[in-house]
Amino acid sequence: MYITCLDVEGVLVPEIWIAFAEASGIPELKKTTRDEPDYDKLMRWRLGILKEHGLGLKEIQATVEKIDRLPGAREFLDELRTFSQVILISDTFTEFAAPLMKKLGYPTLFCNSLEVADDGEITGFKMRVEQSKLTTVKALQSIGFETIASGDSYNDLGMIQASKAGFLFRSTDKIKADYPQIPAYETYEELLGAIKKAMEEK
């Protein structure tokens, strides 16, 4: 039995931190896991910038409310779910993701949680498990699922490489050049076709 595991930001919705960097006028916050493979280091750096500028959860949530899904993302998910179980696996946080899940038709999402002070300052974060994407696909495999995975960033490579089939989607030129063995696609139609084909192969 197959289950498809998808990254969220950059695949189905725009990058939240890039949108917030633009809304807040803080260009440093545009750095994502496409640029920095160490997520823990990236998040601590982000929290330092938020503190420095006196910004907290409320300001980020106001930006998230205005973000829409990427064109075609909802239709892609709806079509994919007609022939495969689907789980979205993201390093984002429940507190950011909820409004976006509504726009995607409430798919199943595995993500993380923030530690927030009474005044709204984000003081820390709690990762569900170490290497959550890779750990999740391995856990699914341990209970009898064949996994198919797709994402755009460094932190997706573990689940992509550990799955029966894995694909890069709208990734960077550098990641595609560094991992030429991983098929890379730019459109939802191509990705749907690749997932279907992988499920047909014994």
What positions do the PLM features span?
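Short amphipathic alpha-helix with an adjacent loop that forms part of the alpha/beta core around
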Residues: 194-201
